[in-house]
Amino acid sequence: MKNLKKGFTLVEMLIVVVIIGILAAAILPRLQGAQGATRDVAREKGLTDISTALELYATAKGEYPAESTTKKDAEGALKEILVDQRGYLKDFPKDPQSNAPAVKVGTQDGTIGQYTYFRIWRNAVKNAAYILASKSESSDKANATQAMLEGVKVSSAATYAPGDTDFNTFQLCSSVVKTTRCAVKGSTAPATADGNGLKKGECCVQDNAELRFVVVR
């Protein structure tokens, strides 16, 4: 009897490899995007939880805790107060990516893998409001750009100075779009009118690495 068993030819195997490669190229970005979106949800929850704890502290003490004296990472400034001393948080939230880039606010550096905390003015009262910031992997969650955060300014003077950042004038983006026509680190403020490919309230970035999620209170 003839042997009816037949193996794959080299050409057939190459075709299978090519098909697998095409499928992987199509599916992998979607999987990575889904994972990034999941991490962004965790970032939003983390910043919201910190903000809630800060409001409880402010209600009890009449002020917000001071930032770290060096890098403006939220954990370094707030963990001992909000977790260890007051018990407002069981654990202090961190970025779901331990190697997430440090988020700079103004001229102050953040810390890798940590959220950033920075106090600003409110109604010309110093340190009466704050910014909590993280990276964002998707434009769906992003509401700010790195350029916007680096434009934040709080002078050392006890009285409000022109150009200082106030809660009432710091505007977040309604959405963030990616375009090569944008500045390197993204928009410094939301668009004030439709034009240049943006709608009023929108911001832009050249690279998703400049996407940020921010809570301002």
What kind of region is each of these model predictions?
Residues 5, 42, 126-127:
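A generic fold-level signal
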Residues 59-138, 216-217:
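Extracellular/periplasmic head regions of type IV pilus-like filament subunits
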Residues 13, 17, 26, 34, ...:
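Low-complexity, intrinsically disordered/propeptide-like segments
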Residues 21, 40, 86, 91-92, ...:
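A generic helix-loop boundary/linker signal
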Residues 124-217:
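Short, surface-exposed interaction loops/tails
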Residues 2-31:
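N-terminal single-pass transmembrane signal-anchor helix
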